[in-house]
UniProtKB/Swiss-Prot annotation:
Substrate binds at N10, K12. This is Triosephosphate isomerase. InterPro entries: Aldolase_TIM, TIM_sf, TrioseP_Isoase_bac/euk, Triosephosphate_isomerase, Triosephosphate_isomerase_AS. Pathway: Carbohydrate biosynthesis; gluconeogenesis; Carbohydrate degradation; glycolysis; D-glyceraldehyde 3-phosphate from glycerone phosphate: step 1/1. It comes from Latimeria chalumnae.
Length: 247
């Protein structure tokens, strides 16, 4: 079966009820033939608000969660709470969580495991920084992180892998469609050799670098690029156009 195209809009720590409400209205009203899966990730404070306002045909994701269901963990939210808001996805291991907040591969693996066991879909992020890329260790870094995640996954049907070329985010550098395809292809091969052929064929590997309306068509035409995790650009109304690039 062909893999269902996946577009995630990560709103990060941006917006308020007024601006996000307007964005959601634009999203809901978009007349776009709908073949893929669109998921938007509002700030935690607006999970309820977003799920209430966003058309049910779109998914909503949290941007993070913790590795247990409840307890003395000030400032954290659990998958159970996310589900209680009617939200079905969570983004884990985003480069900002790793590099700004110091989350380790191990912690992210534990979060992935717990979120999946609670029935959430997980967008698990992996990628390498500029110094790692320049040192020629991209594959080693990316496979190592994927392995930690893979060790914690029993059921892959609810996992989307997002490759973030961290070296290209907000730096003005972009990964060419060929560079992206090469890495996505190697990731799929790694899954085939280390998990199973079935998983390798069915898991969506999406691109989490800088995406613009101009680059998304070219990227989406690559055989192993199954969608996007869009950052800042997802706060603009044109975001809705990204979801139609395969048609």
């Amino acid at each position: 079966a062909p893999r269902k195209f996946f577009v995630g809009g990560n709103w990060k720590m941006n917006g308020d009820k007024k601006s996000l409400g307007e964005l959601i209205q634009t999203l809901n009203a978009a007349k776009v033939p709908f073949t893929g899966e669109i998921v938007c990730a509002p700030p935690e404070a607006y999970l309820d608000f977003a799920r209430l306002k966003v058309d049910p045909k779109f998914g909503v994701a949290a941007q993070n969660c913790y590795k247990v269901s409840k307890g003395a963990f000030t400032g954290e939210i659990s998958p159970a709470m996310i589900k209680d808001c009617g939200v079905t996805w969570v983004i884990l291991g985003h480069s900002e969580r790793r590099h700004v907040f110091g989350e380790s591969d191990e912690l992210i693996g534990q979060k992935v495991s717990h979120a999946l066991s609670e029935g959430l879909g997980v967008v698990a992020c992996i990628g390498e920084k500029l110094d790692e890329r320049e040192a020629g260790i991209t594959e080693g870094v990316v496979f190592e992180v994927t392995e930690v995640i893979a060790d914690d996954v029993k059921d892959w049907s609810k996992v989307v892998l997002a490759y973030e070329p961290v070296w290209a985010i907000g730096t003005g550098k972009t990964a060419s469609p060929q560079q992206s395809q090469e890495l996505h292809g190697k990731l799929r091969k790694w899954l085939k050799e280390n998990v199973s052929e079935t998983v390798a064929d069915s898991v969506r590997i999406i691109y989490g670098g800088s995406v613009t309306g101009a680059t998304c068509k070219e990227l989406a035409s690559e055989p192993d690029v199954d969608g996007f995790l869009v950052g800042g650009a997802s706060l603009k109304p044109e975001f809705v156009e990204y979801k139609d690039v395969r048609q």
